[in-house]
Curated annotation (Swiss-Prot):
It comes from Neisseria meningitidis serogroup B (strain ATCC BAA-335 / MC58). Transmembrane segments: none annotated. Its cofactor is FAD. Pathway: One-carbon metabolism; tetrahydrofolate interconversion; Amino-acid biosynthesis; L-methionine biosynthesis via de novo pathway. The gene is metF. This is 5,10-methylenetetrahydrofolate reductase. It catalyses: (6S)-5-methyl-5,6,7,8-tetrahydrofolate + NAD(+) = (6R)-5,10-methylene-5,6,7,8-tetrahydrofolate + NADH + H(+). Belongs to the methylenetetrahydrofolate reductase family. Keywords: Amino-acid biosynthesis, FAD, Flavoprotein, Methionine biosynthesis, NAD, Oxidoreductase. One of its GO terms (cellular component) is cytosol. NADH binds at T57, Q181.
Amino acid sequence: MNYAKEINALNNSLSDLKGDINVSFEFFPPKNEQMETMLWDSIHRLQTLHPKFVSVTYGANSGERDRTHGIVKRIKQETGLEAAPHLTGIDASPDELRQIAKDYWDSGIRRIVALRGDEPAGYEKKPFYAEDLVKLLRSVADFDISVAAYPEVHPEAKSAQADLINLKRKIDAGANHVITQFFFDVERYLRFRDRCVMLGIDVEIVPGILPVTNFKQLGKMAQVTNVKIPSWLSQMYEGLDDDQGTRNLVAASIAIDMVKVLSREGVKDFHFYTLNRSELTYAICHILGVRP
């Protein structure tokens, strides 16, 4: 293989897209005043890129839910962006979930990310799966509903095939958009996308992209998500524990390489896990041709 020609081909394929790329961004509710400032600075910076939507994660308890609701409403009011709250079936009855969904609809929210949610230790209630939540949302209003997918298999799934069948159930229940867990093995994502097509899943499988600025934090996240960390990725961050600037450059380089290959493979929608930071996501979007 002529690697120089391949690199040129990747760069040329990006330039040929000419703005034919959609991006979306995920944020989470801040825990203190400093993080609150960082969140809104990031939202306003990334707002200029005209994302397809932005999503806000969600905790199981009512306080977290209220914070998510408040952020989503403020995003919509201040920026005009389509804001999608995460919603889970944990720690809320079906009637409560219907009321939450109705409140969102009445507030002008038209998109929801529907998840089962992580069951806390000692949780004994009957599971309310994402498929059930999608059906419930469909019974309330005509939401655009995003659900999660796992190219490297959900940690609780019995098998890769069982996990894929579960995704198909969520689509059949009424979901019309899929966002994947973050990953670093692009080939694994592409094979997963092919298997989705073979099973009759005909919605866009949007890759979740995580620019890694904190490798230690990534290790903790990978343990609970079943995401494989390649050895080459570990080596990239060796010796950088106290060098945030270089870590940022490494993170941007890795993510940019991923989106170049994915775009060459026909991917036109990308979902960025921003961790409430805008700098790297903004730079990666610039490379993709997504600009103010």
